[in-house]
Amino acid sequence: MALIAPGGQQTLVDARGVVRVLAGDERLNFRPSVDVTFGSAARAYSGRVLGIVLTGMGTDGREGARLLKQGGSQVWTQDEASCVIYGMPMAV
């Protein structure tokens, strides 16, 4: 399954493995947030997730990728040469 989160909202996987799209939390800098999605997937599918981080600015995804890796999942990132902005892949 591939998840693509709609702008301004959060996409997460609940404990039963159900994908939920919720209103974005105004306290978070990013909506959607890769950290929210990856973190929830790490809890729901420990060790059975492939996280992919493509071009983007900032550090969103760093904490979620750490949780995925900690649980035994893989995280792939785009290489610097092909990125428009290497911020997110570099942060992971």
What is each of the regions a protein language model found here?
Residues M1-A91:
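Conserved acid/base catalytic micro-environments in cytosolic active-site loops
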